[in-house]
From Swiss-Prot:
Name of protein: Aminopeptidase M1-D
InterPro entries, A to Z: Aminopeptidase_N-like_N, Aminopeptidase_N-like_N_sf, ERAP1-like_C_dom, M1_APN-typ, Peptidase_M1, Peptidase_M1_aminopeptidases, Peptidase_M1_dom, Peptidase_M4/M1_CTD_sf
Gene Ontology, cellular component aspect: cytoplasm; endoplasmic reticulum; extracellular space; membrane
Organism field: Oryza sativa subsp. japonica
A GO biological-process term: peptide catabolic process
Residue numbers spanned by region Required for membrane association: 96-203
Chain positions of site Transition state stabilizer: 390
Motif Dileucine internalization motif in this chain: 721-722
Amino acid sequence: MAAAAAEFRGQARLPRFAAPRRYELRLRPDLAACVFSGEASVAVDVSAPTRFLVLNAADLAVDRASIRFQGLAPAEVSVFEEDEILVLEFAGELPLGEGVLAMRFNGTLNDQMRGFYRSKYEYKGETKNMAVTQFESVDARRCFPCWDEPSFKAKFKLTLEVPSELVALSNMPIVNEKIAGPIKTVEYEESPVMSTYLVAIVVGLFDYIEGVTSEGNKVRVYTQVGKSNQGKFALDVGVKSLNLYKEFFDTPYPLPKLDMVAIPDFTNGAMENYGLVTYREIYLLFDEQSSSASTKQNVAITVAHELAHQWFGNLVTMEWWTHLWLNEGFATWMSYLAVDSFFPEWNIWTQFLDSTTSALKLDSLAESHPIEVEIHHASEIDSIFDSISYDKGASVIRMLQSYLGAERFQKALASYIKKYAYSNAKTEDLWAVLEEVSGEPVKNLMTTWTKKQGYPVIGVKLKGHDVELEQDQFLLDGSSDSGMWIVPITLGCNSHDMQKRFLLKHKFSDIKGINSQYDDQDRQNSGNFWIKLNIDETGFYRVKYDDELTTALRNALQMKKLSLMDKIGIVEDAHALSIAGKQTLSSLLHLLYACRDEDDFSVLSHINSVTSSVAKISIDATPELAGEIKQLFIKLLLPTAEKLGWDPKNSESHLDAMLRPVLLVGLVQLGHDKTISEGVRRFQIFFDDRNTSLPPDTRKAAYLSVMHNVSSTNRSGYDALLKIYRESTEVEERLNVLGILSSCQDKDIVLESLNFIFTDEVRNQDAYLVLRSVIIDARETAWSWLKENWDRITKTFAASAILSDYVKSIVTLFTSKEKEAEISQFFATRTKPGFKRALKQSLENVRISARWVDGIRGEAELAQTVHDLLIKL
């Protein structure tokens, strides 16, 4: 019989001859012993003749003697660990229709932040455990046997047996609670149909604060005891988000309550469990006195993102992980829409270009993937929770909304939510609704954007009074691919408002007479004539202008004739084109010089990112010029940094508060002596007397300044930072310290910092910050450490997302083909499915950097360009 059961091995998905309709679960977590036990009673609908029931189970001990279906014991029970399936084979065919499957099981409350796991916290000086679930993507099977795929939606009725002094939360409100000595039994209301990955449980000691929506839904934020005040901002954003989404989707929030809980140990930023959203503490808690402006904004964006999922993802769920972007792309886009409504002064849609830039960078790799990516095994799923599913997904949604118009787009989304509520949908289902409501050929337009990897670069050439456009796939390795997309083109001529809009459906297109009103003399006059494609960067593509148009745009930028978004697009496109060898670094430096008077947060953030990239590559590409290039960038950033200063002003804007640390950290990383000295001075005053103020927005710059001077023989600053880390109870403060610990050249200090992540003092989810802070001068030290400790790393940090971060952080510091070959050889026998994609992408980035180094070395005019611009500044 086992041979027959084996036919279900190696399948991407479970067979559909039986499906769950209702789960009744009773779970007993033992927080002291870190184990749990449970019983499941599942109403199963058998829809086709079979003698098998096939479901998922992993890391569970299922009591085989307890298994019954309609009173029948299976003749054979097979567990296939690699496939994470449990196959029950019965002696004869099962009766068609609904029957009940019952079983008992037990497992471990693991420390891997997945499935049913334990998280540590401090209470009255004692370390305690809380029990937490994290089931997305495929880890509900680690808590109870189930049909662990999004399309197997069912109702859930949960009962928990927990220590009587603890708070026990689940998706639904409590309907009954009985205390019997040290144990209480908590029974929850039955849920509407939902996917297994959205089931949630949290058990621990908590305080909470409460609000209520316009519909009367209770919203609570749960925190560690004594921290409830830090949940007020998230609560306010949460209530406002539910109210806004109810109106936007024309559909009420589907559940009676919503709880949001801060979890100390948490792999992801947050998880949108239906009615019980869990967060890493840094993404839910905000303290007016000790939190930075960036933390405040991150909390708002994260809360708005997770609550958008209550409609896009929970009420309407993707049919399979291939359509993950329907969850994550829309939640990302909706979060910006919500935050823009709540805080218009944050100019959040301009900041959205951070997401677009991240997606464009990843999607210009040959090792990227389409938005809709085929999933053949559960181990592949986690690797697509990346910038493609989130940021490219959100960016193409923004592009489509721009093309259809906001009103039609909103109406279509509301129709989509209503049509597929309490069920599942594929990407094609969304396109069909959008076509029906808008009357536009949405599927034809969007299919290449979701099913095809990559995106185009649009070449723009001026031919007399006409403009010629040509599209090719853009790849950072400089190779060409004649990929074709239907591209929504927006074009401005001499004005942001003078736009042409059309679809580029072919490789080539001509725009006739666009500049016929300008004679040759006008065109030669600086700033009199310019053309900008992709107005406000609503399209997901890059643009390469010919030399004449490049010069004209540079002049327009210098004369402040472009919108903030257009400035960002021009700078980011030029940076990418330089890396790909399609434009010179000299051309990019001239463009950055044209931005010398810029003072906007978003634009300067992108400029700072580009200058950091160029400064790093110059160390390998042109070491004799690296110092001068840094001085050039210091001169570019310094005027605005000096105007802002180190101390916040009472009346300053949120964006100025965000800009200050960007510039100060940038100047420290570029080695600006005056900024470093001031950072060290302020740190010393703060360290000597903690009652002195070191504003949260400037702490990272001060800490980084201290690390600049640290060495094995001068480690007082390093020890002071570790003391702050150990004494602080504020999450943001501890993360600030971790994020700079490896930022020095001294080999011994770097190794001490890297080994620090193996101690109990660093939570697993935070360890990547130490690796990310390694500087180029210490990359060989870090690489040797990674090789020597790889087995320990994979054992300690099993989550594939964490391993991916480790690999990317260190591998991408290198810029030679020889190093790429060495790294590739090391990992040849050490890959795991969960981080294989991240490794391939990291190695590709090394090859791209090596090619960029070669290109820069071949630029004869670069030294003269740097000298000339230094004199001008």
